[in-house]
Regions:
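Extracytoplasmic surface signature
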Residues: 1-299
């Protein structure tokens, strides 16, 4: 075995470990993002030291210099950063934190990509179990889509109940009509992940109570926030990766009857047969024909 401490790199073509990249995080790494030029790797998570040096929940590495830790980039998030994205000179961050560099920031913040200084971009999440799990910037750099378990952003719960579009320059909440349909937040539900392309944004969700959260599955909306399609296959859905023609999701789906797919089946043990992932067509031609089983939300 080759020791690694919460982060590693491997070659895509072979799967072989990259021996020269071995920073040590003293807590979990949760998100990665590259600078526009591909020279700087940003790593977020629940750590306060990297290679024995103080770096609080966000660090940067110089890939043009063998992945060396960039000591000068040292923003101080008071606790976990769960998701990040980088555009130009700005690193956007979401998580469970309450302050950045000593300044109040409730779950959402932006810092300078070189210095780590706190930027004026300020949006505040609130509610029971308020956290941000997914954050991505639109390809044109004008909007930020965020998802999580928060019940409001800047005091707004529609949009803002687990999902919202924000202005990338001002952090002002933008019209997100899909949030009138997709409602996942609170103690028993969340939007777990978001992804983007030129045509819109994608999200995934889980629900333990349809009174607080109504989708287990994935969805796509356009950049005006209008719903394009959704697949309510029953089972927590964790991440999403879109291409032009397909969408890949990781989950534990057990019934896709809602869109004419497989029904619940049981293993010889009697337990439900959960899938670990699905591939879907990236198309609005999805017909939701039945509610499915076990009292799930009826789309």
């Amino acid at each position: 075995e080759t020791p690694r401490s919460n982060i590693l790199a491997y070659t895509l073509s072979t799967g072989e470990l990259v021996e020269g990249f071995a920073p040590a995080l003293n807590g979990p790494g949760r998100a990665l993002a590259l600078s526009d030029d591909g020279r700087t790797l940003y790593v977020a998570g629940g750590f306060n030291q990297v290679d024995g040096k103080w770096h609080n929940n966000l660090a940067a590495f110089d890939l043009s210099n063998g992945g060396a830790l960039i000591d000068s980039f040292k923003p101080v998030f008071n606790t976990t950063v769960s998701t990040i994205d980088v555009v130009g000179s700005t690193v956007y961050a979401g998580g469970y934190f309450k302050s950045v560099n000593g300044q109040p920031r409730l779950g959402l913040a932006a810092v300078d990509a070189s210095t780590g200084a706190t930027l004026d971009w300020t949006a505040s999440i609130s509610g029971i179990n308020a956290q941000v799990y997914g954050l991505r910037v639109s390809p044109d750099g004008t909007k930020v889509v965020v998802g999580g378990s928060f019940q409001a952003i800047n005091g707004s719960s529609n949009p803002g109940y687990g999902l919202a579009l924000l202005d990338a320059n001002t952090a002002q909440i933008l019209p997100t009509p899909v949030n009138s349909q997709i409602r996942n937040a609170g103690r028993y539900g969340a939007i777990y992940d978001v992804a983007v392309d030129d045509n819109g944004f994608y999200g995934t969700g889980y629900s333990m109570s349809i009174s607080e959260a109504n989708i287990e599955g994935a969805f796509k909306a356009d950049w005006n926030g209008q719903l394009i399609w959704l697949e309510p296959c029953h089972g927590d859905t964790y991440s999403v990766y879109p291409t032009a023609s397909e969408v890949y999701v990781t989950n534990h789906a057990h019934s896709c009857q809602t869109i004419g797919g497989f029904a619940d089946t049981r293993l010889p043990s009697g337990h439900l047969d959960y899938k670990a992932g699905l591939a879907l067509t990236n198309s609005p031609d999805v017909t939701i024909g039945t509610q499915g089983t076990d009292g799930y939300y009826d789309w």
